[in-house]
């Protein structure tokens, strides 16, 4: 949250030079506050587990957030009870006339599926096009990043030969960027993907600013300069056991997966893994809610014209 200080305090300009968000008394006096409306397009099979992961991170902010869950796949789910979907999820037709402060598009286990073979690919394109006029800021996670880069920038699907699975080190490129505010210079985050995100590709074919990348030169966190779209290629929302569950699932399926990198103590799957990315995940989502949503969204959502003073 911003700090509130008198307009004339010398610290105002000093802190702003470091890109610290300072709210002057004159601006604060005219600021109205309401709950933020955040839409979550949940593409993961185990929807309840995914809900828990994202809501845990969103709840770590002092901001009040109203959550709406969205589904676009009408097929019967094998992993989530129909009663749960009917009670807690809406269809796109239910909300297409509404506006939202934020939208989160989750990952999906579709890394080896061509875009046009995804059953709900037309609906994904519809939601992304709709979000341009109805959402202040959208956050794409893992597979959704790949889908958005294709739809919004025409970047072809980039696929790794082997699945990237484990907990990897990253470093920030812009220490004073709002989305990385408070990040350590280097930090850990989990990945579980076939999608490939070379930083050079993002720089060459988009106007997006890369804010953090892996030690191997893959883009991890990047965003548009107007803060309307942000991308995270890993899974900072994952629980401590999620990578283990995926690993043992693949073992049982006879896929002979590699042991997730830097995850199990002593690289032994019989050891209980520890989460080393919780603080990063919480800070990332808090920064997104504050700087990319709350600070630029209009008070009256009927008039969508996000700006940042």
UniProtKB/Swiss-Prot annotation:
<feature type="active site" description="Acyl-thioester intermediate">
    <location>
        <position position="142"/>
    </location>
</feature>
<dbReference type="Pfam" id="PF04204">
    <property type="entry name" value="HTS"/>
</dbReference>
<feature type="binding site">
    <location>
        <position position="249"/>
    </location>
    <ligand>
        <name>substrate</name>
    </ligand>
</feature>
<dbReference type="GO" id="GO:0008899">
    <property type="term" value="F:homoserine O-succinyltransferase activity"/>
</dbReference>
<dbReference type="InterPro" id="IPR005697">
    <property type="entry name" value="HST_MetA"/>
</dbReference>
<dbReference type="GO" id="GO:0019281">
    <property type="term" value="P:L-methionine biosynthetic process from homoserine via O-succinyl-L-homoserine and cystathionine"/>
</dbReference>
<feature type="active site">
    <location>
        <position position="237"/>
    </location>
</feature>
<keyword id="KW-0486">Methionine biosynthesis</keyword>
<feature type="site" description="Important for acyl-CoA specificity">
    <location>
        <position position="111"/>
    </location>
</feature>
<keyword id="KW-0028">Amino-acid biosynthesis</keyword>
<keyword id="KW-0963">Cytoplasm</keyword>
<comment type="subunit">
    <text>Homodimer.</text>
</comment>
<dbReference type="GO" id="GO:0005737">
    <property type="term" value="C:cytoplasm"/>
</dbReference>
<feature type="binding site">
    <location>
        <position position="192"/>
    </location>
    <ligand>
        <name>substrate</name>
    </ligand>
</feature>
<feature type="active site" description="Proton acceptor">
    <location>
        <position position="235"/>
    </location>
</feature>
<protein>
    <recommendedName>
        <fullName>Homoserine O-succinyltransferase</fullName>
        <ecNumber>2.3.1.46</ecNumber>
    </recommendedName>
</protein>
<feature type="binding site">
    <location>
        <position position="163"/>
    </location>
    <ligand>
        <name>substrate</name>
    </ligand>
</feature>
<comment type="similarity">
    <text>Belongs to the MetA family.</text>
</comment>
<keyword id="KW-0012">Acyltransferase</keyword>
<comment type="pathway">
    <text>Amino-acid biosynthesis; L-methionine biosynthesis via de novo pathway; O-succinyl-L-homoserine from L-homoserine: step 1/1.</text>
</comment>
<dbReference type="InterPro" id="IPR029062">
    <property type="entry name" value="Class_I_gatase-like"/>
</dbReference>
<keyword id="KW-0808">Transferase</keyword>
<dbReference type="InterPro" id="IPR033752">
    <property type="entry name" value="MetA_family"/>
</dbReference>
<feature type="site" description="Important for substrate specificity">
    <location>
        <position position="192"/>
    </location>
</feature>
<dbReference type="GO" id="GO:0004414">
    <property type="term" value="F:homoserine O-acetyltransferase activity"/>
</dbReference>
<comment type="function">
    <text>Transfers a succinyl group from succinyl-CoA to L-homoserine, forming succinyl-L-homoserine.</text>
</comment>
């Amino acid at each position: 949250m911003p700090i509130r200080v008198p307009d004339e305090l010398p610290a105002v300009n000093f802190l702003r030079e470091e890109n610290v968000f300072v709210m002057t008394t004159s601006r604060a006096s005219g600021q109205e506050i309401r709950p933020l409306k955040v839409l979550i397009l949940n593409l993961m099979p185990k929807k309840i587990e995914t809900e828990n992961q994202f809501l845990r991170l969103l709840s770590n902010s002092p901001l009040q957030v109203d959550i709406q869950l969205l589904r676009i796949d009408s097929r019967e789910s094998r992993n989530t009870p129909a009663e749960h979907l009917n009670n807690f999820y809406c269809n796109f037709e239910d909300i297409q006339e509404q506006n939202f402060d934020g939208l989160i598009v989750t990952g999906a286990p579709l890394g080896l599926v061509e875009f046009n073979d995804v059953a709900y690919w037309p609906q994904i394109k519809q939601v992304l096009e709709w979000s341009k006029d109805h959402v202040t800021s959208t956050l794409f996670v893992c597979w959704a990043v790949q889908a958005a880069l294709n739809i919004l920038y025409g970047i072809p699907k980039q696929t790794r030969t082997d699945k990237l699975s484990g907990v990897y080190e990253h470093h920030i490129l812009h220490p004073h960027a709002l989305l990385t505010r408070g990040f350590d210079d280097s930090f850990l985050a989990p990945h579980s993907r076939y999608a490939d995100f070379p930083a050079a590709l993002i720089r060459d074919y988009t106007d997006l600013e890369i804010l953090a990348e892996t030690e191997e030169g893959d883009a991890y966190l990047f965003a548009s300069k107007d803060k309307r779209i942000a991308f995270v290629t890993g899974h900072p929302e994952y629980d401590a056991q999620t990578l283990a569950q995926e690993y043992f699932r693949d073992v049982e399926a006879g896929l002979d997966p590699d042991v997730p990198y830097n995850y199990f103590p002593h690289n032994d799957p019989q050891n209980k893994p520890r989460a080393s990315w919780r603080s990063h995940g919480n800070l990332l989502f808090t920064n997104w809610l504050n700087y990319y949503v709350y600070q630029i969204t209009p008070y009256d959502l009927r008039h969508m014209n996000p700006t940042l003073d």
